[in-house]
């Protein structure tokens, strides 16, 4: 019995050596950045961290009752990106976490005039950044992009800025870009990186009779040899989807003499590229084959004629 008591006292002494979770923080006491906007103006880097309310994402057993909670947008400014981050800290009321950033949005002004090497250094050295973040560009003020809401008071987390792959599965209008792809292409001399550009629009949605702002993809910005080259608009990128092996589903309007005759859904492009040098210049020939479904034809048409019309339409793209 004495041995058991001595053993118990011996074990009790070790309890005082155990560490506790004294530095643990409750989730509501930490500010989690959802999207990070980066701009460049008057030789200063400006960051715009976007914060969202996670309570609108909670699962409810009864009828959904989502209370409207707009995104909160911070701002920091400095000669360097790190300096801008510490400038933002001055007004932060709680600890800020950079570990769960879903996407980065940079302005065209930053791509043209900012230091892209500094951006890569900023994202590489800070251990909380993840390489799986989505990368976007924009020509619009970042406040407009980051403040755009979602329908039914659904969290801003569920937008194309954070989940672009959801809409791409239904209609492949753009090829979303991950940070690890951007960084790997950035150091390749022969690679051109296409950054999808975001814009706001009121053309497609209304809340009752009131125009409702939503995000959309509208063009690409191109980077080559570590410098911003130019942007490509809707008409310029019309054929890009057919050169992307990840295109799962994309529509094509069939036309004959500028008259719409049908709608096809094309998918799973197979691309065979051949490169040759002629008179000292490279020539590239691409043979593309796709699977497709005919969704609508305005009048009966043989399959071989549909294929012929399709080939003509694709070449024009």
UniProtKB/Swiss-Prot annotation:
Organism (species): Bacillus anthracis
Alphabetical UniProt keywords: Cell membrane, Germination, Lipoprotein, Membrane, Palmitate, Plasmid, Signal, Virulence
Subcellular location: Cell membrane
Function: May allow B.anthracis to germinate within phagocytic cells and therefore involved in virulence.
Keyword Metal-binding: no
Protein topology in the membrane: Lipid-anchor
InterPro entries: Spore_GerAC-like, Spore_GerAC-like_C
Residues where lipid is bound covalently (N-palmitoyl cysteine): 21
Statement: the UniProt record of this protein carries the keyword Cell membrane: yes
GO biological process, one term: spore germination
Family per similarity comment: Belongs to the GerABKC lipoprotein family.
Lipidation (S-diacylglycerol cysteine): 21
Signal peptide: 1-20
Lineage: superkingdom: Bacteria
Entry protein name: Spore germination protein XC
Primary residence: membrane
GO cellular component terms listed in the entry, alphabetical order: plasma membrane
